[in-house]
């Protein structure tokens, strides 16, 4: 059930939360861990309970990895379409978890799937958000060659979100992969241009440029840290903030 706020003023009115498909695997090697879904539903419910409007984009890497098949000769467009279907499956699972927690949610797909999801319509999405429903955007942008990170940034801009929150397995952006390099240092704050110049690999080039060109702040944080999401929305300094540099 959506929990009521504890009296703190939320810093953001509307957010776009980007989850990787791999995040839904939990400790499994493939598929969806129901415990992870339930935990994410609880955390999203806390945000709804304090009046924050939540849009969600989920990747599909836990169900389908197109890179290996593409390398083996599969047509890239076909692989990308299969990846879009994987994101729809994840979106349906997340909607189910939210509804079981008594949180109203709707899936809007960029590709038409009559009887399964609603088709994406910006004006309808805005109305659902204003009605305190969680809107889960599925099937990426609906076009091949675009990542779900790009889709998340695009949807955030379209719905006039205050920030993109990218949930990862590490607590921010580092100079190198902290799992491989024990000397990697964490950044608390970066500009879009610094991310591009340093080739930090936070998101793909298209996604970062979209955020930069439309002045959309981006925060990268560790989704496995209890309370991190709520802390960010209350103005806490979790992870790494990426935004426009000073002119």
UniProtKB/Swiss-Prot annotation:
Catalyzes what?
Answer: UMP + ATP = UDP + ADP
Disulphide linkage map: none
Keyword annotations for this protein, in alphabetical order, are: ATP-binding, Cytoplasm, Kinase, Nucleotide-binding, Pyrimidine biosynthesis, Transferase
Q: What highest taxon heads this organism's lineage?
A: Bacteria
**Activity control note:** Inhibited by UTP.
Which compartments is it annotated to reside in? Cytoplasm
Pathway(s) where this gene product acts: Pyrimidine metabolism; CTP biosynthesis via de novo pathway; UDP from UMP (UMPK route): step 1/1
- For the keyword Cytoplasm, the answer is yes
- BP term (GO), one: 'de novo' CTP biosynthetic process
The residues listed in the UniProt record as binding UMP, with positions renumbered to this chain, are: 60, 80, 141-148
Could you tell me which InterPro entries the record lists for this protein?
A: AceGlu_kinase-like_sf, Asp/Glu/Uridylate_kinase, Uridylate_kinase, Uridylate_kinase_bac
Q: Which GO terms describe its molecular function?
A: ATP binding; UMP kinase activity
Residues holding ATP: 18-21, 61, 65, 168, 174, 177
User: What does this chain do?
Assistant: Catalyzes the reversible phosphorylation of UMP to UDP.
Q: Which NCBIfam families match?
A: pyrH_bact (TIGR02075)
* Family indicated by similarity: Belongs to the UMP kinase family.
- Protein name per its UniProtKB record: Uridylate kinase
Q: Source species, please?
A: Pseudomonas fluorescens (strain ATCC BAA-477 / NRRL B-23932 / Pf-5)
């Amino acid at each position: 059930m959506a929990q009521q706020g504890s009296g703190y003023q939320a810093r953001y009115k509307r957010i776009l939360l980007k989850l990787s498909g791999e995040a839904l695997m939990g400790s499994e090697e493939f598929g969806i861990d129901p415990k992870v879904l339930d935990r994410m539903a609880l955390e999203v419910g806390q945000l709804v309970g304090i009046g924050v409007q939540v849009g969600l984009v989920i990747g599909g890497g836990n169900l389908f990895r197109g890179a290996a098949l593409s390398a083996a000769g599969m047509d890239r467009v076909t692989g990308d379409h299969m990846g879009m279907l994987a994101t729809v499956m994840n979106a349906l699972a997340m909607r189910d978890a939210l509804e079981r927690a008594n949180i109203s949610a709707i899936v809007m797909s960029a590709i038409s799937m009559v009887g399964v999801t609603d088709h994406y319509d910006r004006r309808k999405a805005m109305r659902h958000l204003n009605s305190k429903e969680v809107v889960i955007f599925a099937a990426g942008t609906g076009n091949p060659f675009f990542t779900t990170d790009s889709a998340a940034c695009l949807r955030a801009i379209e719905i006039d979100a205050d920030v993109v929150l990218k949930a990862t397995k590490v607590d921010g952006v580092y100079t190198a992969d902290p799992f491989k390099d024990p000397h990697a240092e964490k950044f608390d704050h970066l500009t879009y241009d610094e991310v591009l110049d340093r080739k930090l690999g936070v998101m793909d080039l298209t996604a970062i440029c979209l955020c930069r060109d439309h002045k959309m702040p981006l925060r990268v944080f560790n989704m496995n840290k209890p309370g991190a999401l709520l802390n960010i929305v209350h103005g806490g300094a979790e992870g790494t903030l990426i935004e426009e540099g000073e002119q």
